[in-house]
UniProtKB/Swiss-Prot annotation:
Residue sites binding Mn(2+) 1 per the record: D212, G213
Database matches in SMART domains: PP2Cc
Region (Disordered) residue spans: 122-154
Record-stated family: Belongs to the PP2C family.
Pfam families: PP2C
Cystine bridges: none
Organism: Oryza sativa subsp. japonica
Binding site for Mn(2+) 2: D212, D512, D575
Residue ranges of domain PPM-type phosphatase in the record: 177-584
Cofactor: Mg(2+); Mn(2+)
UniProt-recorded name of the protein: Probable protein phosphatase 2C 26
């Protein structure tokens, strides 16, 4: 049955009390995906190190019937996994809404943006006010382009503008309660894609993880639950240091203690003598494998003292590598222990993209073909002239007016700089590396795939292409001819440190589905032009709309015809896609004295 997303959009209201974190209910076309944005809390201006980035995100699901994960973080924490393919969970400074897409040829709809927090909106909104409904028959008029740039896009609207958003845009929303611990988080899923965002106002850092799963959702779910937790441990002493240990609660001493088998005996009482392992297996097992929102909440409750500015950038990259190695080892160990009951875990995996922003430093780690791009103004010696892109640029659906110079080159204001490295059989160096590592296997690359299975050459999980014992535990139809002991798929990431300068305007982080239809140059050009014309629009959702428009055009169908194709079947036309646009305009951190 088709999703009917383009025509059947039923109304829903935010009628239940809002806890400290609110899950966006699967209303409207929530199964299609969701958009979200980060809006700093009203109290942030009082902090000396307030976060100044604007974050716009969107996720699109092509798969609706994602199987229930064999590894389920929510169930491990005592919850029940929801049965829909797209969901989003946030703390207070994030707002989220189901995707509401429109055909770009008729003009974009701006249905995502910060929620005003100046009007004492720290609790649930009036349930009588419908915050969602059918798309308007005509798209709203675009905002005036007289004032341009990201600064308008991410400034806080007045309460009157919120009312206009309700009446004119019929926007569904979730307004969680305010949190005061300085840590804000969001995580969501769309098909087999997962996204995890953590903002630490006090520590002046931003963590973004985009995990593009394949052969099942178990690997990306495991990454959301565990990678940030491992990374935070590795960053101790680099990004932060523990405050006075005397202020720790008892359970924090227990969790942070050494993993030995010594008994804890409070002398004289005789009433509390349990081993640390036993405590972790009971009360603290939930902490160890809690859902990803607990990563933000548990660590946010700890007393952390700011560390000095980072000078050893290699130490940060090494911490990222160690955190990934620990997460991978834990996942493969879980897979090994589950082979008797759930051998399917051996084939599940994920491409990975992590961006860590601290002050004016960006650290990127990636496996697979997801990408991180920074849009830069040309330097003084660069005339901004780009050849060979005219034919593709005319497909960008936001009414571009491209200036040309003699010789047929297009002039653009911003250029893309890719911070990640693609790992696939399309990269000649990767193919040569695998063949060098497997000289006795002339079938290591078959049909442009590793062992005829995967297009990517580096990934998280996928144990059947890393360990012979995991491969041999599969049914014969899934088993590879595994020769030797060397992994066919590597978990060695590519790493990058980038120092932000006045040239850098925004970051675009995305899973590979975006680049099925757009090049790096087109992505930057689209976001730049869109935000100049519609400063209050949603650049991430606009990229999703552009992707769908191109997919429909390539398939020879109407935009809404594509949306009405049942999810699962629509996977033939586009992949699950997660996109994040992070503005770098304005001061990065209030305390850093750095302007971009």
């Amino acid at each position: 049955m088709g999703s009917g997303a383009s025509r059947l959009l039923t109304a829903c209201t935010c009628s239940r009390p809002a806890p400290a974190s609110v899950d966006a209910e699967p209303c409207l076309d929530d199964a299609l995906g969701h958009s979200f944005c980060y809006a700093a809390a009203a109290t942030a201006t009082a902090h000396s190190s307030s976060f100044r980035h604007g974050i716009s995100g969107a996720a699109l699901s092509a798969n609706s019937s994602v199987p229930v994960p064999l590894y389920n973080a929510s169930a491990a924490a005592g919850g029940v996994a929801p049965g829909y393919s797209s969901a989003f969970h946030t703390s207070s400074s994030f707002s989220s809404a189901p995707l509401q897409l429109s055909n770009l040829s008729s003009g974009p709809l701006f249905l995502s943006g910060p929620i005003d927090r100046a009007g004492q909106l720290s609790g649930p909104l009036d349930p009588a006010v419908p915050f969602s409904g059918p798309l308007p028959a005509k798209p709203p008029k675009p905002a005036s382009s007289s004032s341009r740039g990201f600064s308008r896009r991410f400034r806080k609207p007045s309460f009157g503008s919120l009312r206009r958003s309700v009446s004119e845009k019929n926007r569904p929303c979730a307004v969680p309660l305010r949190r005061d611990d300085g840590v804000q988080w969001a995580h969501g899923r769309a098909g087999e894609d997962r996204v995890h965002v953590v903002v630490s106002e006090d520590q002046r850092w931003l963590f973004v993880g985009i995990y593009d799963g394949f052969n099942g959702p178990e690997a990306p779910d495991f990454l959301v639950t565990n990678l940030y937790r491992f990374l935070l441990r590795e960053l101790r002493g680099i990004f932060y240091k523990e405050a006075d240990a005397d202020n720790k609660k008892l359970w924090q001493f227990l969790v942070d203690g050494d993993d030995d088998d010594s008994e804890l005996d409070f002398s004289g009482s005789g009433r509390f003598a349990l081993s640390l392992d036993r405590l972790k297996e009971s009360r603290f097992h939930m902490w160890a494998h809690a859902a990803a929102d607990e990563s933000g909440r548990e660590w946010g409750s700890r007393r952390l003292a700011p560390a000095p500015a980072v000078r050893d950038h290699a130490a940060v990259l090494a911490a990222l590598t160690r955190a990934l190695a620990s997460t991978e080892a834990a996942y493969l160990d879980m897979t090994d222990q589950s082979m008797g009951t759930h051998p399917e875990l051996a084939v599940t995996g994920a491409c990975l993209l992590v961006a860590l922003v601290r002050d004016d430093n960006v650290y990127v780690m990636n496996l697979g073909d997801s990408r991180a791009i920074v849009a830069q103004r040309p330097d003084d010696g660069d005339d901004g002239c780009v050849f060979g892109t005219m034919r593709r640029m005319e497909d960008v659906g936001v009414g571009l007016e491209i200036e040309t110079r003699p010789g047929g080159c297009a002039i653009i204001g911003l250029k893309p700089l890719q911070l990640s490295t693609d790992h696939s059989t399309s990269i000649e160096e990767e193919v040569h590396r695998i063949k060098r590592e497997h000289p006795d296997d002339d079938q290591c690359i078959v049909n442009d795939r590793v062992k005829g299975r995967l297009k990517v050459t580096r990934a998280f999980g996928a144990g059947y292409l890393k360990q012979a014992k995991l491969n041999n535990g599969l049914l014969e139809m899934f088993r590879n001819d595994y020769i030797g002991d060397t992994p066919y798929i590597s978990c060695t990431p590519s790493l990058c440190h980038h120092k932000l300068t006045a040239r850098d305007q925004f970051l675009v982080l995305s899973s590979d589905g975006l680049y099925q239809y757009l090049s790096n140059e087109e992505v930057v050009l689209h976001v730049e032009n869109f935000m100049e014309r519609f400063p209050e629009g949603d650049p991430a959702q606009s990229l999703i709309e552009e992707l769908l428009s191109r997919a429909a055009k390539k398939a020879g169908m109407d935009f809404y015809e594509l949306l009405d194709i049942p999810q699962g079947d629509r996977r033939k036309y586009h992949d699950d896609v997660t996109v994040m646009v992070i503005s770098l305009e304005g001061r990065i951190w209030k305390s850093s004295g750095t302007y971009v």
